[in-house]
């Protein structure tokens, strides 16, 4: 850890004597800078452009070196808007990579990509900073223990359980509920979880970032009265920001999480919403840097960029980072290079389905498409594994029969198939659940369902003990006892 040269005015003045360049070309968020011979900055060095625009407004733009072009020229990407910059402006090489504040003082605060607080609560009380570019932990430092991370969401815990210290992806197109699911996980896990959380808002809506902040203050995850007791640090680089900021804000959040893991030796939760925007920003910058586009117009360095971020999210002997990432799926196409590259890094995938969302089943998690490396008898136990497999078999059979039902109707099915369909429809509805963060929309209080309760509920449906209950009794309830109580209420209403 070291003091960030960009935060100290005296440090900048000494650097000014050292290494000055001038802007030679501006192409949107990308700048070409000429330096004196033999004084070329390194790749990833932070450059500072200071001066005044034509109206006399103060300019302070930080850029990151991406390419050394030869002829004493470097190409850099700006982390903020380049409005007002002109050719010939002075550029200072800070001599180091971009550094951001880390440690306990970051909790309860909102930062931008540069690690500057944007919540109007004054400066951050820390002199400890860390560079955003670091190598992943060495192989020998990694921790390989396997344990389940309970979320209280039935469909996740039963069919695609999350790994403690693992990487989890929430895949879905526009408007199927990725952000709501992430907010529910923050609510369920961050409250019950003893450690700290870091939330990286990468290229998503500013309104959602604001809603999340307000919600965290209401729930006490951020303590307004005593900010030091807060449990979460927020890092935002929203949709309206230049691609440089969106491309690096994930690394800023990750750097803060790494400090809690490596120095404070804590278990950390890292939420990233949305990892696709990280790829998208890289793609925007890539063309401006003069690289030839690859498949579907993405950057040729897609796998490398994704790998350098994802490999740092891991568990070591000191502590763990459990990462939950929302992944936007363009046009609902899971074979698109961005989601396809992300898949390779994950321990569990939660796939959200537009078909289920259209039916009103929330969370709209597809039970057959979602996967987890943790769903093995030696990890979760025989009972959990058997129940999950039977649930999947029943739902798969129902899926196969849907064409026959659509053409011929239910009456043409065999007795056994009709029973399977009835149970599958109950299972489908029982996989829905009222969320704490969606109470405002649904009017139903949120429910947290423990893993043992979840397994018991599905075993009762599969065994046929609840065949007599109407399927609507299983819709948007918590545990199975609530479903039986709801069935009795429905029966009473009929009378």
Swiss-Prot record:
Gene transcribed to yield this protein: atpB
Membrane topology: Peripheral membrane protein
HAMAP family given in the database record: ATP_synth_beta_bact
GO molecular function list: ATP binding; ATP hydrolysis activity; proton-transporting ATP synthase activity, rotational mechanism
Chief localisation class: plastid
Catalytically driven reaction(s): ATP + H2O + 4 H(+)(in) = ADP + phosphate + 5 H(+)(out)
Enzyme class: translocase
Species assigned in the record: Brimeura amethystina
Pfam families: ATP-synt_ab, ATP-synt_ab_N, ATP-synt_VA_C
Keywords, ordered alphabetically: ATP synthesis, ATP-binding, CF(1), Chloroplast, Hydrogen ion transport, Ion transport, Membrane, Nucleotide-binding, Plastid, Thylakoid, Translocase, Transport
Disulphide-bonded residues: none
InterPro entries per the UniProt record, alphabetical: AAA+_ATPase, ATP-synt_VA_C, ATP_synth_F1_bsu, ATPase_a/bsu_AS, ATPase_alpha/beta_chains, ATPase_F1/V1/A1_a/bsu_N, ATPase_F1/V1/A1_a/bsu_N_sf, ATPase_F1/V1/A1_a/bsu_nucl-bd
Cellular-component GO terms for this entry: chloroplast thylakoid membrane; mitochondrion; proton-transporting ATP synthase complex
Top-level lineage group: Eukaryota
GO biological process: one example: proton motive force-driven mitochondrial ATP synthesis
Residues the record lists as binding ATP: 172-179
SUPFAM superfamilies linked: C-terminal domain of alpha and beta subunits of F1 ATP synthase, N-terminal domain of alpha and beta subunits of F1 ATP synthase, P-loop containing nucleoside triphosphate hydrolases
Protein name stated in the entry: ATP synthase subunit beta, chloroplastic
Subunit text: F-type ATPases have 2 components, CF(1) - the catalytic core - and CF(0) - the membrane proton channel. CF(1) has five subunits: alpha(3), beta(3), gamma(1), delta(1), epsilon(1). CF(0) has four main subunits: a(1), b(1), b'(1) and c(9-12).
Location relative to the cell: Plastid, Chloroplast thylakoid membrane
CDD domains, per the entry: ATP-synt_F1_beta_C, ATP-synt_F1_beta_N, F1-ATPase_beta_CD
Family according to the record: Belongs to the ATPase alpha/beta chains family.
């Amino acid at each position: 850890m070291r003091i960030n040269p960009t935060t100290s005015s005296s440090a900048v003045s000494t650097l000014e004597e050292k290494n000055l360049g001038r802007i030679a070309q501006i192409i949107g968020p990308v700048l070409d800078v000429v330096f004196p011979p033999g004084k070329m900055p390194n790749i990833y060095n932070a450059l500072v452009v200071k001066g005044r625009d034509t109206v006399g407004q103060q300019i302070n733009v930080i850029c990151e070196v991406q390419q050394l072009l030869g002829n004493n020229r470097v190409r850099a990407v700006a982390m903020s808007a380049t409005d007002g910059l002109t050719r010939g402006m002075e550029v200072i090489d800070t001599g180091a990579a971009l550094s951001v504040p880390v440690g306990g003082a970051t909790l309860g605060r909102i930062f931008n990509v540069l690690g500057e607080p944007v919540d109007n609560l004054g400066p951050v009380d820390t002199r400890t900073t860390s560079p955003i570019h670091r190598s992943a932990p060495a192989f020998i430092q990694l921790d390989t223990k396997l344990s389940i991370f309970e979320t209280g969401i039935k469909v996740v815990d039963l069919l695609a359980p999350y790994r403690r210290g693992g990487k989890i992806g929430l895949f879905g197109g526009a408007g199927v509920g990725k952000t709501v699911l992430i907010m529910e996980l923050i609510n369920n896990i961050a409250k019950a979880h003893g450690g700290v959380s870091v939330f990286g808002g990468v290229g998503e809506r500013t309104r959602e970032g604001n809603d999340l902040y307000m919600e965290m203050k209401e729930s006490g995850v951020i303590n307004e009265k005593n900010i030091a007791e807060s449990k979460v640090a927020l890092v935002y680089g929203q949709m309206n920001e230049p691609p440089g900021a969106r491309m690096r804000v994930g690394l800023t959040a990750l750097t803060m999480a790494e400090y809690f893991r490596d120095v404070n030796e804590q278990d950390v939760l890292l939420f990233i919403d949305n990892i696709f925007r990280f790829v998208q920003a890289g793609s925007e910058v890539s063309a401006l840097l003069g690289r030839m586009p690859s498949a579907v117009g993405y950057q040729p360095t897609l796998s490398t960029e994704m790998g350098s971020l994802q490999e740092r999210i891991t568990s070591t002997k000191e502590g763990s980072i459990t990462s939950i990432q929302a992944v936007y799926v363009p046009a609902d196409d899971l074979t698109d290079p961005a989601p396809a590259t992300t898949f390779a890094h994950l321990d569990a995938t939660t796939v959200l389905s537009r078909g289920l969302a259209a039916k009103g089943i929330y969370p709209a998690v597809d039970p057959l498409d979602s996967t987890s490396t943790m769903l093995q008898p030696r990890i979760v136990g025989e009972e959990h594994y058997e129940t999950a497999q039977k649930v999947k078999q029943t739902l798969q059979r129902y899926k196969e029969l849907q064409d026959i039902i659509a053409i011929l109707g239910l009456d043409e099915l065999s007795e056994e198939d009709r029973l399977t369909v009835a149970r599958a429809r109950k299972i489908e509805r029982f996989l829905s659940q009222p969320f704490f963060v969606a109470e405002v929309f649904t009017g139903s209080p949120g429910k947290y369902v423990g893993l043992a309760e979840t397994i018991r509920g599905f075993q009762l449906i599969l065994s046929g003990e609840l065949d007599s209950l109407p399927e609507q009794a299983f819709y948007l309830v918590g545990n199975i006892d609530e479903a039986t109580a709801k069935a009795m209420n429905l029966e009473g209403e009929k009378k």
